[in-house]
Amino acid sequence: MMKGGMGNLMKQAQEMQEKMQKIQEEIAETEVTGEAGAGMIKVTMNGRHDVSRVNVDPSVMEEDKELLEDLLAAAVNDAVRKVEETSRGRMEEATEGMNLPPGFKMPF
């Protein structure tokens, strides 16, 4: 490989790293809302998995404590799944056309 080719390759790698870092920052700021019990429990979290809001329909509080706990856990899990799906989708968009093997993890 010629010297210029290696320099170009390094430049492309640096540009990709900067692009991926920007996308990761955008994902961290993205908010998703997980739901359970047909929307009776809603949990909002960001891409860093920080929960910012929990909304509980008043009718759920009239039910038993165990049901409320189960619905809260389900809503949090739903929000986590949505964060992961959003992250995966954004990363796939960013690496589209790079011919990476399936499941390849970027080192940054």
From Swiss-Prot:
InterPro entries: YbaB-like_sf (IPR036894), YbaB/EbfC (IPR004401). It comes from the Bacteria. It is found in: Cytoplasm, Nucleoid. Residues 84-93 have a biased composition (Basic and acidic residues). Keywords: Cytoplasm, DNA-binding. Coiled coil: none annotated. One of its GO terms (molecular function) is DNA binding. Its main location: cytoplasm. GO terms for cellular component: bacterial nucleoid; cytosol. Residues 84-108 are annotated as: Disordered. Pfam families: YbaB_DNA_bd (PF02575). PANTHER family: NUCLEOID-ASSOCIATED PROTEIN YBAB (PTHR33449:SF1). Binds to DNA and alters its conformation. May be involved in regulation of gene expression, nucleoid organization and DNA protection. Homodimer. Belongs to the YbaB/EbfC family. This is Nucleoid-associated protein Csal_1459. It comes from Chromohalobacter salexigens (strain ATCC BAA-138 / DSM 3043 / CIP 106854 / NCIMB 13768 / 1H11).
